[in-house]
């Protein structure tokens, strides 16, 4: 299966919030890195601090982070800095945050690598915090920033206070730049739950019910009783029901309603939909209704997909439906458009990145445009691309039968069985849709390699190697298409045997499409493998393709017998 694209977010805080020219020069460094999307620049006058947010694939985000830290070190003199916010360097903090396809632990590794590079190349000492911390106590940013900038000269002389990377004596350069804290943390979601009340007190009561910190325990259990204290004289708290959350209640003049305002600090512990349901429950206990949800800032796509899937399962409806449909369910279920229209293309990080990438894709064409593009006097898109699309259509047909079966009257007890098949079908379809464009890209790589200069012996050698690498890639892509398309047979066999009998012909067409995809992609494996100088590799790839062709022919014959018997 095609691996989910890795995306991370970086939110560096720079110790300059007043000089717009300096801020612009720093953010220009971010935008100079191809593949990075600058999402937000938030300068603060009183804090004299600017929070910058950008996203992209890990390698380019880390590069952009390094460049903006470098520019900040050149432009900001900490000896002249004064502001209301704690700080210890020109770049005060630089956290990396997982968004999609990557774990917090992997981000922590990247953060340490970034910290080491900053220390080695820029001579800016770095402390690692939160998930990137090298010692338990340094997970706390406040420990890393102890004494702030003014305390650094003393800390640089103490072994226990030495930075994780770049320990050095205090000098004029270090006095200018200060130190930087580089870390990795989970994605934070800021959200407000809309209430059908104007009472801030009741909104606060709901917030205290759910937030992890909870509320003070009071004598007699009365809301006006004195707070109870432990033997140390500290107020005893009664924890709320939602871990990894902070919340308060407030009234918003703009909307004329009260809200429960919440920060979810770890969406793996408390996903948005879980928070929504719990706030609804606690509100209902107090005679109040949640009318909708307001998302502040941006969110990862998985937040909406998990929510939509959750609400579909509550309805006992198939979850093997297109991504857009799942997100629509999430929007409706949590009332994300209660106060104003909610556009996923403007609120979901992955979609913003997609819209930034202007590379034209075949899968974005209409059916007519795709057919016309294929018919034109150009070798790509060609048979490999069409094979991948045939496989995707086969998977789509099998998935359609699964969804029809999941919702068939009288089959309610089997909804989950067919929903699971539909999910598998959607995954196969998504994998093959990626290969539609990847096959054309593979051909274009070969053409680009043949276009390389060949004037000198070095150029000839480099060109020859590039051609072989591109040819190998162009052989492996259709082989991937064959493997993905072959998985369609299992889906369509199950639907032919167990699915809605009224749709058995659709399962049959899915089988025929899958066979065409496997055999068609096999032709591409063979013709491209013939261009490989490594004949051992070529023979191995062709043998693998021939095996898949044989298995596809057998599977098609077996399943079509089942289909024909039910017509």
Residue ranges and their predicted role:
Residues 357-366, 372, 480, 484-487, ...:
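Polytopic transmembrane helical bundles with strong interfacial aromatic enrichment
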Residues 389-393, 421, 428-435, 474-484, ...:
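Amphipathic alpha-helix face/heptad-repeat signature
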Residues 68, 370, 396-400, 442, ...:
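Amphipathic, well-ordered alpha-helical segments in soluble domains
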Residues 407-453, 548-557:
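A structural-propensity feature for long, helix-poor, extended segments
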Residues 2-369, 376-377, 454, 459-462, ...:
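Long, contiguous binding/interaction regions
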Residues 10-12, 16, 88-95, 266, ...:
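Conserved phosphate/anionic-ligand binding catalytic regions in large, soluble enzymes, centered on
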Residues 114, 124-128, 137-140, 488, ...:
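Preference for long, well-ordered alpha-helical segments
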Residues 187-189, 439-512, 516, 528:
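Amphipathic alpha-helical interface segments
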């Amino acid at each position: 299966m095609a691996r989910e694209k890795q995306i991370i977010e970086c939110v560096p805080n720079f110790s300059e919030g007043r000089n717009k020219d300096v801020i612009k020069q720093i953010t220009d460094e971010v935008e100079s890195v191809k593949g990075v999307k600058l999402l937000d620049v938030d300068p603060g006058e009183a804090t004299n601090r600017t929070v910058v947010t950008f996203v992209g694939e890990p390698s380019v985000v880390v590069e952009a982070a390094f460049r903006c830290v470098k520019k900040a070190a050149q432009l900001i003199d900490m000896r002249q800095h004064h502001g209301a916010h704690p700080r210890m360097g020109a770049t005060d903090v630089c956290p990396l945050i997982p968004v999609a396809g990557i774990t917090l632990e992997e981000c922590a590794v990247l953060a340490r690598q970034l910290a080491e590079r900053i220390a080695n190349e820029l001579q800016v000492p770095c402390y690692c915090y939160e998930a990137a911390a090298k010692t338990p106590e340094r997970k706390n940013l406040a420990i890393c920033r102890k004494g702030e900038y003014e305390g650094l000269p003393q800390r640089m002389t103490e072994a226990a206070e030495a930075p994780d990377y770049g320990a050095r004596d205090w000098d004029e350069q270090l006095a200018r730049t200060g130190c930087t804290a580089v870390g990795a943390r989970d994605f934070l979601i800021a959200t407000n739950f809309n209430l059908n009340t104007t009472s801030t007190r009741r909104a606060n009561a709901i917030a205290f019910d759910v937030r992890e910190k909870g509320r003070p325990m009071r004598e007699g259990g009365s809301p006006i009783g004195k707070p109870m204290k432990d033997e140390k004289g500290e107020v005893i708290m009664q924890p709320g029901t939602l871990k990894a959350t902070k919340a308060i209640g407030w009234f918003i003049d703009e909307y004329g309603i009260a809200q429960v305002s919440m920060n979810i600090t770890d969406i793996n512990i408390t996903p948005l939909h879980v928070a929504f349901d719990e706030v609804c429950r606690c509100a209902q206990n107090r005679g109040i209704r949640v009318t909708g949800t307001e998302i502040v800032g941006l969110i990862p796509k998985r937040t909406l997909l998990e929510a939509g899937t959750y609400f579909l399962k509550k309805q006992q409806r198939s979850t093997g439906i297109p991504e857009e449909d799942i997100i629509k369910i999430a929007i409706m279920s949590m009332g994300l458009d209660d106060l104003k229209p909610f556009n996923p293309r403007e609120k979901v990080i992955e979609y913003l990145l997609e819209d930034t990438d202007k590379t034209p894709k075949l899968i974005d064409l209409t059916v007519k445009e795709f057919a016309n593009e294929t018919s034109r006097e150009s070798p790509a898109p060609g048979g490999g691309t069409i094979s991948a699309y045939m496989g995707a259509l086969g998977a789509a047909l099998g998935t359609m039968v699964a969804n029809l079966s999941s919702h068939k009257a009288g089959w309610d007890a089997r909804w989950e069985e067919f929903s699971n098949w539909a999910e598998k079908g959607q995954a196969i379809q998504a994998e093959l849709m990626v290969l539609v464009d990847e096959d054309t890209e593979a051909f274009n790589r070969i053409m680009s390699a043949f276009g390389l200069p060949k004037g000198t012996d070095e150029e000839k050698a480099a060109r020859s190697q590039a051609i072989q690498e591109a040819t190998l890639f162009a052989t492996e892509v259709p082989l991937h298409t064959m493997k993905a398309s072959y998985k369609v047979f299992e889906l369509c066999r199950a639907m032919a045997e167990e699915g809605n009998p009224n749709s058995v012909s659709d399962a049959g067409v899915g089988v025929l499409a899958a066979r065409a995809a496997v055999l068609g992609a096999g032709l591409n494996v063979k013709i491209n493998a013939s261009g490989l100088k490594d004949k051992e590799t070529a023979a191995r790839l062709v043998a693998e393709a021939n095996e898949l062709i044989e298995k596809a022919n057998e599977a098609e014959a077996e399943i079509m017998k089942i289909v024909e018997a039910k017509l």
